[in-house]
From Swiss-Prot:
Residues 964-991 have a biased composition (Polar residues). This is Integrator complex subunit 10-like protein. May be a component of the Integrator complex, a complex involved in the small nuclear RNAs (snRNA) U1 and U2 transcription and in their 3'-box-dependent processing. It comes from Dictyostelium discoideum (Social amoeba). InterPro entries: Integrator_complex_assoc (IPR053129). Its main location: nucleus. Residues 319-333, 549-609 have a biased composition (Low complexity). The keyword Nucleus applies. The lineage of its organism: Eukaryota, Amoebozoa, Evosea, Eumycetozoa, Dictyostelia.
């Protein structure tokens, strides 16, 4: 049907549109629309009608041209936003950041993406069809779409028609796909151009076609960036920043390669595109900060918990007093005290805040940030806050963004894989390369700084200090002074990122060795699961057999039933070799090999049924015990006799690097930045392994004193689960071994461990009654002793030993005995010596010789402490002797001493004897009673002893703290100026 132009001229625009819509012929409708467009230029209805017709005709190239006309027409501003958001709605479930929050942070997801007004609607009953249709109706995005649709009610007919054709054509999808196809075609054409068989003319034609295609492709790319920016501008005006950043992240991900190519380009013809990409990026940064400012206030974040740090040891007591006073005032005002669950919740919120906002910054800013100059930030002056009432003076710097990008990598505490390390390595390498122009040096190896965190992390640290130990290599003058300052600032930031990353990785690799027996990190060979009823940590390693039955327990589990852990260090290697042999056999097709496979599988099943688990390791360090050795003593150190396996040697390398980086970071110019990292980013229980490695590095390198009390929050037990205390016990054990300055605190730590773990019964034998003959004394009581560690060496140096509950028990008792010895508590030492009698026998006889005044005959024995010697010169004093001493050989020796005329003060205050013979009779009666009592065993006595000792030291500590607190209160109130008050205080203290 032909279009009558004269008739059309006489019709109004409404009539023309009605006629177009009623037309059943697409060609007629198109002709009417084209002719009417010449009469009514830029009419919005005719424009969108033409757009609709082009889609129906499947002429998508024309559709894109018309879509850009719609985009440039201000009347379609909201419609364009609607199109973009509908595309986002379709893609949203596949977006990394959206999925990350949805899966990991439900509470934050509700606050950010869920429309509270729609919650009731979403929760109400509705038909299944409606639920399928509106599966995301609870999102704020749905509210935004509804609002836009209502504002576009005058275009509802066209929007509905276009939506019905969406399966054939979506402008955003078409542009993205077309861009990728053009890139692939250009690459293919470039490959063809390199073919020697192509003629020169063909090459010219192809080059021309490539240029045209590239220009068109680049124009569409820039238009897409502009399209997204305008859509995000609309969202930001309505404070919907969360969807702005999703759009920015989506487009940045789609054009990652193109953006990287242009941002790195130095070609003159690419500079215009490069500047527009930067404008897009800066607008994205602005949206990210607006998003963070909005939702960080809605997500309740408490300040980090107070921590005792290595750095401020001198003024720590003063700060602690101030904090205690402030806490007391707050408690009086509130009338209640926050419990540990609330504090843990606050710390979790802090961690959530870190990951919630660092992830999008990291994904959006890298690697673009490395190609942005500081001056560009200063010129654009991007603000950290926006909106009414905001602080417009706070601007964002380049290094601030770089810092946030880096922190994302080191805030993930519970799973460090090869992929994680390579991401950190890539970041550090890109950052180092971005500062090449600031470094002036004649040595290219210094300029081309190469970082390899997996295979040679020590070299990265050494190379960093080498490149900064030598001069700039250039002449110093005023012109270069600014460059020198910029270079210095850059190197400082590179240092904090590199050294902290090395500390982070080396700590994990050392910890991995402790748990799995190997510090190697290979692809997908380690997973961490931090959730059982006891919050146990499971580390699965490729080196260990993963085919065990569920009934035999999981490999690598840290548990309190550690009998299976008492194996040699070489068992794992043997098991690995067996498994490798089995795998090799499985690859053969011979019948004999199949038979071998069956045998091997049977062997594996037998091993699994035995519940074998990988060895755990720990460091032992007998500093207190060997501090009795002076320079003049003859002492044969057995440390050279200890043979470290390859895996142990590798683990010590990581521990050494951990210590070196820690020492580096505790110096200027990094100490303040490192404090902030420890007090915020790493101030969380999931970084227990990092503090574990830091503690071990201190123990290994003999950093004795109060600074071995690592910063683990205001209450040490909050960092570990008290229901599964094995790791916590091991930490306290090492503190007890090395803490010279607070012996009584170490004793409390050790006693808490000993109460929490089980003491196994000693080897049993047939019970026998006591008779007066000495030969009959060799009975059950004599045999009641525990099995000591098989890894005891006479050395002052630390070394690795098996980590098991039995090993913890031995070293706790051993360390407790040395703590008692340093306090001169000889009787308490004697009680502990019964637990491992054969091991401590020689030391017990040193005490006996000291009582008798007999000099030590063996110069290689560790001498008793000076305080023990001084007390024994007065006499052996232990009023609880008959409550806890049941070892027959000990009792015989004390009878022998009494026969020699030496005095023992071992009776209660209300008991007296007239002669040593009477005391001997009491001891013999004691032997008779104890041997006839089957319930009187070493484990029972030790448990009773540990509880009694802990109560004693806790009461003593409480009284000491009360006295300290009352003294501080008096000093702060000024009462201490009164002579009367001072006099009364002295009387109280003397009492």
């Amino acid at each position: 049907m032909m279009v009558d132009n004269e008739e059309i001229n006489s019709l109004s625009i409404e009539n023309i549109l009605e006629r177009i819509n009623k037309s059943s012929n697409i060609n007629e409708a198109k002709s009417l629309c084209l002719f009417a467009s010449s009469l009514f230029d830029n009419n919005q209805y005719l424009l969108i009608q033409r757009y609709l017709i082009s889609i129906k005709e499947r002429d998508f190239d024309i559709s894109i041209q018309l879509f850009w006309r719609l985009f440039n027409n201000n009347s379609f501003k909201e419609y364009i936003v609607l199109v973009v958001l509908k595309f986002l709605e379709k893609e949203i479930e596949d977006l990394e950041y959206y999925d990350f929050i949805k899966k990991n942070y439900r509470d934050q997801f509700q606050k950010i993406f869920i429309d509270s007004d729609d919650n009731s609607t979403n929760n109400s009953s509705s038909s299944s069809n409606e639920n399928k249709k509106n599966k995301r109706s609870y999102l704020k995005l749905n509210t935004i779409l509804n609002k836009l649709t209502k504002s576009l009610n005058h275009l509802s007919f066209y929007i509905s028609e276009i939506d019905n054709l969406n399966k054939f054509f979506n402008p955003i999808t078409f542009l993205l796909n077309n861009n990728n196809n053009n890139n692939n075609n250009n690459n293919n054409n470039n490959n063809n151009n390199n073919n020697k068989n192509n003629s020169n003319n063909n090459n010219k034609n192809n080059n021309n076609n490539n240029d045209d295609s590239n220009n068109n492709n680049n124009n569409n790319f820039l238009k897409i960036l502009e399209l997204i920016q305008k859509s995000c501008q609309y969202l930001n005006e309505n404070e919907n920043y969360e969807y702005s950043i999703l759009l920015y992240l989506l487009i940045k991900g789609k054009f990652e390669n193109k953006i990287r190519t242009f941002i790195k380009s130095s070609k003159k013809e690419d500079q215009d595109i490069k500047s527009k990409i930067k404008r897009f990026w800066f607008n994205g940064i602005q949206s990210l900060n607006q998003y963070k400012n909005k939702y960080s206030s809605k997500i309740e974040i408490e300040p980090p918990l107070p921590m005792k740090s290595y750095f401020d040891e001198d003024d720590y007591d003063q700060k602690q007093q101030q904090q205690q006073q402030q806490q007391q005032q707050q408690q009086e005002q509130k009338g209640s005290k926050e419990d540990e669950e609330d504090i843990e919740k606050q710390k979790k919120s802090l961690t959530s805040e870190i990951e919630l906002f660092l992830l999008p910054i990291n994904r959006f800013c890298l690697p673009i940030i490395f190609h942005i100059e500081n001056e560009e930030f200063e010129q654009l002056d991007i603000k950290g806050n926006s909106g009414s009432g905001s602080d417009s003076s706070s601007s964002i710097s380049k290094l601030e963004i770089v810092d946030q990008c880096w922190k994302y990598y080191i805030c993930k505490g519970d799973d460090i894989t090869d992929e994680s390390i390579l991401e950190i390595q890539k970041f550090l390498q890109q950052f180092a390369d971005s500062g090449k122009h600031l470094k002036r040096h004649q040595n290219n190896s210094i300029l081309n700084f190469t970082i390899n965190l997996l295979s040679n992390p020590e070299k990265a640290r050494n190379d960093y200090f080498d490149r900064n130990s030598e001069g700039n290599g250039g002449d110093e003058n005023d012109e270069n002074s600014q460059e020198s300052n910029d270079s210095y600032e850059f190197e400082i930031h590179l240092g904090i990122y590199l050294l902290s990353s090395l500390l982070y990785i080396s700590s994990w690799r050392y910890f991995k060795f402790l748990v799995t027996g190997s510090s190697n990190i290979e692809k997908q060979n380690i997973q961490t699961i931090g959730t059982l009823k006891k919050n146990q940590i499971l580390l699965f390693d490729a080196n260990f057999n993963s085919n065990s039955n569920s009934s035999s327990g999981s490999n690598g589990i840290i548990n309190n039933n550690s009998n299976s852990n008492q194996q040699s260090y070489h068992n794992n290697n043997n098991n690995n070799n067996n498994n490798n042999n089995n795998n090799n056999n499985n690859n053969n097709n011979n019948n004999n090999n199949n038979n071998n496979n069956n045998n091997n599988n049977n062997n594996n099943n037998n091993n699994n049924n035995q519940g074998q688990q990988p060895n755990l390791s720990m460091i032992t360090h007998q500093v207190l015990y060997y501090s009795n050795v002076d320079d003049e003593s003859s002492f044969d150190d057995e440390f050279p006799k200890i043979v470290f396996t390859k895996q142990q040697t590798e683990a010590i390398k990581h521990l050494t690097l951990c210590m070196e980086c820690f020492n580096d970071l505790n110096q200027e110019p990094w100490i303040n930045d490192f404090k902030r990292i420890l007090s915020t980013t790493w101030n969380n229980s999931k970084f227990y392994w990092l503090y574990n490695s830091l503690a071990d590095s201190h123990y290994y390198y003999k950093l004795d004193g109060a600074n071995t009390l690592i910063p683990i929050g205001d209450s040490k037990k909050r960092l570990f689960n008290p229901n599964d205390e094995l790791w916590f016990n091991r930490l306290l054990l090492n503190i007890g071994m090395t803490n010279h300055s607070e012996i009584e605190d170490s004793i409390i730590c050790l006693l808490e461990i000993l109460i929490s773990i089980s003491i196994p019964p000693p080897p049993s034998s047939s019970s026998s009654s006591f008779s007066s003959s000495n030969s009959s004394l060799n009975n059950d009581l004599f045999n009641q002793q525990l099995v000591p560690s098989k890894h005891t060496f006479k050395t002052i140096k630390p070394y690795l030993t098996v980590f098991s509950e039995e090993e913890i028990l031995f070293w706790c008792i051993d360390t407790l005995a040395t703590c008692y010895e340093r306090l001169g508590m000889v009787g308490e030492i004697t009680v502990l010596y019964q637990a491992y009698w054969n091991y401590y026998k020689s030391r017990f006889y040193q005490i006996i010789n000291e009582i008798k005044g007999t000099p030590n005959q063996n110069p290689n024995l560790i001498p008793l402490s000076n305080l023990v010697k001084k007390d024994l010169q007065i006499g052996y004093f232990f009023p609880r002797f008959f409550d806890y001493i049941i070892n027959i050989e000990m009792l015989e020796e004390f009878c022998f001493i009494l026969n020699k005329g030496f005095k023992l003060d071992i009776l209660q205050r209300n008991q007296t004897v007239s002669s040593n013979r009477e005391m001997i009779d009491i001891i013999k009666r004691h032997i008779t009673i104890t041997t006839s009592n089957n319930n009187l065993t070493i484990p029972i006595l030790l448990k009773q002893f540990f509880n009694e000792e802990l109560d004693h030291f806790l009461i003593k500590k409480e009284n000491r703290e009360k006295q300290y607190s009352s003294s501080n209160t008096a000093n702060n109130s000024g009462v201490n100026n009164s002579p009367i008050h001072n006099q009364n205080t002295d009387v109280e203290m003397n009492e």
